Amino acid sequence: EVIKDPYELAKLGPLAANGAIWIVTRDGYRGGPNVTVDASLTASMASNGDVRMTNANDERNFRAGFYPEGTDLDRYLPAYLKDRTDPMFFGVPGWAEDYYNTPQLQYNVNASVAGGKGIANYLFAIGTATNEGMADNTDYSKYNIDFYLNMMPVKGLTVSTILQATKVSRSRNNTLRDRYAEMEYFPSLSTPLPPTQSGSDTYLSYLDDSKDDNDNIALNGSLALNYLWRALRAGVSVKFDYETDVRNAFWPTTVIESMNFTSNYSAYNRRFIGDFYLGYDIDFTKGHKLSFDLKGAMEEDRFHYNYTRGYDGNDDMHKSTSGGGYKVTNFLDQEVLHFMNSSLNVGYRWRDYLSAGVMFRYDGVTSVHPNHKWLFTPAANLNWNLKHSLMENVSWISDLALFGSWARIGRYLPSDRYGMGPQSTSENIGWSGSWISGSYNQYATATRPYTFGWIGFGVEWPYADKAEWGIRSKWLKNRLSADVSFYSNRDKNLLVKLPVAHEYGYDGQYKQGMEITNRGVELSLAGVLVNQPNDGWQWSVAANFAFNHNELSSLPDGLQQAETDGRLLKVGEAVDRFYVLENNGIYQSDAEVPVKDGRKMTVNGVELKAGDPKWVDKNGDNKITDEDKVLKGHSLPKYTGGFSTQLKFKRFDLGASFFFAAGQSAMNYRAYQQYDFTTLDKGDNLAGVKEIFFWQSGNVPMDYPRYNALSEVHPYRADQDLYLEKVSYLKLRSVTLGYSV
């Protein structure tokens, strides 16, 4: 069950600030069948014939169109595009035969046994699932075992226990980008993987000696005691969640320029929760009822990891850091967060006509500054059933109700470093993600610039003000239903990294005061169009639609805009917009280039010429700079929805479901990588990494302007709307055919 009601989310607290999903379990059977087994098998095929593979000859011909006529291409092309007799690059492409898996199998097998009576019952379940990926020999396997026990040792007292264990193993993809990011080491990127079958086979044979084991084990459970006596109810419970993540990776000398690499990573995340509740109901005359609920909880979250990396071992026989002569570096860290909350909920109900509730809650956390550990978060709701109170005799209306709720919910900060106060924090002498706080041994000087950013005193709780109101209805003896709701979600007091002068030694300053507002509407319709139980026919349909608008409402210190991490945050604009230059084509001649005060338009001091892009000069200074960038498009869809239908005939059923998203855009990174070859071929960075599927056509538009590859203005830079594409879609999510035994 998806929980979206702000009032219900407020009962769960900050962990549900982004929403929550209830997983409802059932008790053990009380008589009747007590053993169940179910299984499913799905096979899918990747159509390799639809992959339009290319080779070096195709790439050479593509690049030739970007140079002036008569240019000696071999002066500018990389080595792998020069020798047309090289069979590895100019031969028939065939890499897709090994890359795409055919067929792919997905299966699930589950079994359970249950039993017992009213005073004691149990449920024991086991299951396994496997999902083979579409490409790169990826797969996923999962094993789980669950045990549920309910007992009533004395009247009114129930004891409930849940134990769940899960193991997940995953075979990762072999992309070069992921490997280089893990190693933090770049070999030469001058030559990509060859596209031919023999070249692909050779590379895969090198990977046969590699290792990339990924295992995740999770164990969680709870013990709850609940007592009910007349109008009094009480309970206490303990819950735990323990998860381990282990990854062992090794890449041999054959794929890293005669150097090997190994890493061992182990981590655990541990959560422990103890909570209680005490409730009492008061019934008045004429159907009026009051309920009081007092709740409290304490929670501890602990995150711990050990990470060891080894470079340049003696040979490829030792695949771990425990031996083999590796140059080893070790990293470890632990973070502990504590949470506490208490709340009082008062509910009111008048028969089936009206219900209302208010909640007063305090949350405390250790990840904010000590002076601001506590946050008060109230909530309220109201439900009015028009059918029961005003329209009892209207037969064609089955149900009609108005509802509304509001809540303030705190948001946990992702780390306790924000509550530590001023710090000189850098990762320049560590590894990516391993932060070092300079405090002695001249670290505060040696680690400049401080890439994490300045944090001052007084970091407080971020929080969200959520509101929802709408109407629920059912018609014609519940055969038709229509629900509509309007919502507002205002995230306030958010941290944002703002730019500061470089002389401070920081690359930014974290400040609170950013506010982001999301508003929208959700509509759902459902109906049973045909219902003939005597003949066994039933046809039902359902549809849903949602619209969302996000907006930056404020920035710290009254700022109206700020540029951070390549994005422009501007008050009154959506936060998911792209910050790009507007591209209006190509200058066909030098005479087309605008001239102001006797000087031609420039880009970083370089004059534009024929064959260069027409970027829009927004501020009219005859210079193309970041000040000419505009906000365009949205990375998140504005409209989402779906449609489903199900046709039943006796024991058979046929169903289909569709999903759509519209109003979003995306930057075609693949096109950028293809067109900006003159820049990316020269640099050793992740943007220049060419995966095996670089040798594939069809994903890159061929109608872009052909700019001069020798231009000094970087014509195919990434931050322009040339690559911005609308990516709305309608997707067939599933088609199912079933038979009930």
Kindly label every feature range from the protein language model.
Residues 1-3, 12-18, 29-38, 514-519:
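Periplasmic N-terminal gating module of Gram-negative TonB-dependent outer-membrane receptors
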Residues 112, 538-542, 634-662, 717-741:
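Conserved C-terminal beta-signal and adjacent last beta-strands/turns
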